[in-house]
Each structure stands twice: as C-alpha cells, then as structure tokens.
Amino acid sequence: MRKWGIVFLAVALLLGDAATGWAVDFKVKGSWQFAFDYINGGNFMGKNRQGSHQIGQQWAAIHQKRDEFEAIQRLHLQLQAVASESLAGVVFFEIGEQRWGMSAQGGALGADGSNMVKVKQAYVDWMPPHADLKVRMGLQGVRLPGFALDNPVFNDDVAGITASYAFNKSFGLTALWMRPYNDNWLDTADNGVTADYLDNFDLFVLLAPVSLDGMKITPWAMAGGMGPNTLKPFTVRNAAGNSKTFTFNNPSSQAIDGLQMRDGLFPAAFSSGRGGASLWNTAYSTMFWGGLTGEVTAFSPFRVSWDFIYGSVDNGREYLNRQGWFGMLLGEYDTDWGVPGLYGWYFSGDDDNPHNGSERLPYVATTNNLTNSLSSFGYRGHPIMGGGKGVLGTNPNGTWGVGARIKRLSFMDDLSHTLRVNYFGGTNDPKMAAYITGRRPMDGAGRAVYRNNTDFNSFGTYLTRSDSGLEINFDSTYKAAENLSFILETGYIHLWLDEGTWGRYENIAGDSLNYKDAWKVSLNVIYAF
C-alpha cells in the first residue's frame, strides 16, 4: 500500500502545483483490467521426456508453472502535463500484474505487494517554434512499422529520443536512438574493476513514411551495436547425453524481455571447436534490419497490405551469427457486417548446419503490449493482459502459414466478433531438432553442440518442415457502457509433430514425447477512463 500512496501523493502534488498559477493543464487517463483465464495444454505436453506429467503453461513464449485457471488484475495510469500545444510531459504507471491469491504480487490476503508499482513510460514531447519537427525524449513505447502484421523485430518500452519531421502532407522522416541496456554488468570475476564496461546496447532507426492518395508506404532501417559484456556472464552447463546448454545473464527486470535477447539475437543451437571464454565474442556485435511495408486502399472497400523484412546480426563468430527474412501479404474486404480477409506469411528457417549460424530472422523484443493480429492464443492478439496468449511464441519466427479471418463481425449493437483460422508449418530443417533436444551432442565434424532451446516448446515453439499446426480463435467484444468492455476469447491449437523428428531421444533415457492439444477460454473486463 505504501507504493500506492506514493503514486497518488505524486498526483495530488502535481495537481496542487497546477492550482498555484502554472499554465499547465493536467490530464489523467488509464484503465483497470481484469482477466479470468482457463488454459488446458498450454505447453502442449501431456508427459515430459521422463514420462512425468508436465504442469504449467507457456505465456509470452516462456515456460511458467502456472495454474490452469487464474484471475489477474492490472491498473494503467497515465498523467499528462500539457504546457502548450508544443510542450507536454507524460508519465505512465503500471500497477500489477497481480495474480489473485499470490502474496509476492500483492494479491493474497492483506493485499500488500511491495513491488507492483512500475514506471512504464516517462517522456517529454516538444515541438520547436515555427518548425514541423516533433521530439520525444525519455522512456517511451516504440513499435516499428508493419501494415500486414505487427512488426516482429521490435515492439517494447525503451529509453531513447525520437525526432519526426514532416516535409509535407505526403512525406516525412523519423529518426530514433534507443538504449535498451547499459551499466548492468557487475564483473564479479575481476572484483568490479571493469564493471559497466563495454556493456551498452544501442539501436538507431530511420523511417521514411510516404502517404499518397490510396496508398501508404514506409521503408525503414535499424542498425545497432551491442557490447560484449551486455549479456555477461555466459553460462555453459553439461546436460544429459553429453550435450551442453548455454544461457546468458538477464539484464532486464522483466524476465521475458531479457530472455528474448538470447532467443532473438543468437542461434537456437550452434557448434564450435572452441571452449571457455574464447567461445564468445570479445568485440561489439553489430546488427542491421531493413524493411518495406505498405498498403493500398485505392480500390476501397478492398485493401491490400504487405510486409517485408531482412535482418542480420554479426556476433563475431560464424556459429553465433544470425540472418533471415520475413514476408507477408494480406487482402481484405470491408462490408457492412464485417471485414473478411485472407493472408499468408513466411519466415526463413534454419538449415541443418549448426556451425554456420542461424538462418532465422533476428529480433530484439516483441512482448510489451504486442498486438499480433495473427491470433489471440498462439500469439498476443489484443494489448490486454492475461495468461491466455503467446503459447506459440512472441512472433511466428521460423514458420510459414495461411489464414482466413473476419474482423468486426457484428449483427447487433455493441457486440462484435473476430474469427480466425490459421494453418501453419515450420521452416527449420528437421535435423536441427536432434541438436536442440540433445540427441546429437556433436556435429558431423566432431564439434560440441551448445543449445539454447531444449525442446520444441522450451522458448516459444521451434517447428521444423516436418511439423504443422492448426489454430482457431473466436473472440467477442461487448461494450456494456461507454467506458466498460467485456472481451471473451476462445482458442484451440493442434500441432502435428513429426515423431521421427521429436518423438524419442536416441541417446537419453526417457519415454517418447506425449503432446496434447491446447485450448482456452478467457474473459477480460476493462474499464477505461
């Protein structure tokens, strides 16, 4: 309760100062969010490799031992101090998530959580006089562009500076510097002598949106450098069957974001004849992404949109490098009763060589408030909380798929529905499964294999060309009042996993994998003000 008091005391002081004569207009908005989720089979396992019942579920692509039914709440509170049309400051508090009954999150009897109040965003917006330039400085939400699909490379809160200039109504330019990490390395091995040294991670973005009659196009590029100490210490452990696993330090208080750095910028498994400290890069990692996204609405009510992205990361060792691409095409038709659409996507996948790096598209972070329009169960279809999302992963990396959907399907006032049906498969070589599961602890040249993932569902889903799946969503939104909404989500996922690829360890004792379907029912209640 102490931190709650601090938040509302700050609000009172700000509003009180405004009354003393400052020409500042204070605005408050936010939302109370409640989620009641039931998920069955959220990790797609009935029994694990050892034949034991596998509990828990995947949420936002990471295994968590969570109950099948959960009740969760969260409060978003945004304060805006507006001095003029050209100057304003914003602070965005997030209180929760709080799982009902969980003491550590303040949801147990007494409700005294000690770490639930977080500053999600805090920035200043400024426009110089007589210029069409907009500057945003501070902790802010950044979402790279995507017209067909929410961008699968970066979508998160981050510290940085954004500058946008409009040359005219048709053409603009946006530049952005972001600093995801810095000064987090403790260097315990050297008594802290070189702590916080070479551990910065910086990204630079350039966007050039073009708006014409009936068409919008946005080419964009992002480049960056990551210090060799950013994710230290690197840890290698011996696993069953003489295989090895690797993990990195997690410099983020949001564990999911930190784990995504490992999963998004490095291979799922690699092989090397090196050992010890020489296994890793000692210089800055460099990275680049380039994309082209757009939509055509000239033939309204028919709309076509597309995305294309290429990305590469050089981690200083061939086996640690990663490069890949992604493309998607969407066509939809707007009617009085809904918006039916067809779409298809393709992400490049790994080949069968763990020594030449990864061929999957690299990414940085895509969890925070992600609205992935592909689905609301396998991925995060709505920017609302709840455990019933992201069981396939944070994005469809390493997959291809086709789908059909109907958005805004409505036959009565204040009630709308979304229906999605997706059929998808993996684009990774089936031989990679043997390295990921530890069945093959060495590559064909006798080099040791180090694996980040440990199974098809250890961090998101790693699907091969021998695997496929089907997902069905039916989601309904009822607007009970101007500020009150009820959202009911239902979802079902079936995976066809190739038994020859994933079914049994060859060198490790254990039963064959027993996988199961996943399904959910989730009710969200949102009061927005």
What are these regions (language model features)?
Residues 130-135, 148-357, 404, 423-425, ...:
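Signature for the C-terminal beta-barrel architecture of outer-membrane proteins
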Residues 389-392, 397-432, 516-518, 522:
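Exposed, low-structure sequence patches enriched in small/polar residues
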Residues 35, 515-529:
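Outer-membrane beta-barrel "beta-signal"
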Residues 341-343, 347-398, 404-407:
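C-terminal outer-membrane beta-barrel translocator/porin domains of Gram-negative envelope proteins
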Residues 26-34, 77, 89-91, 133-135, ...:
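Transmembrane beta-strands of outer-membrane beta-barrel proteins
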Residues 367-390, 428-460:
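Flexible internal linker/loop segments at domain or repeat junctions
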Residues 38-74, 78-131, 135, 143-153, ...:
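Surface-exposed loop and membrane-interface regions of Gram-negative outer-membrane beta-barrel proteins
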Residues 1-25:
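Cleavable N-terminal export/targeting peptides
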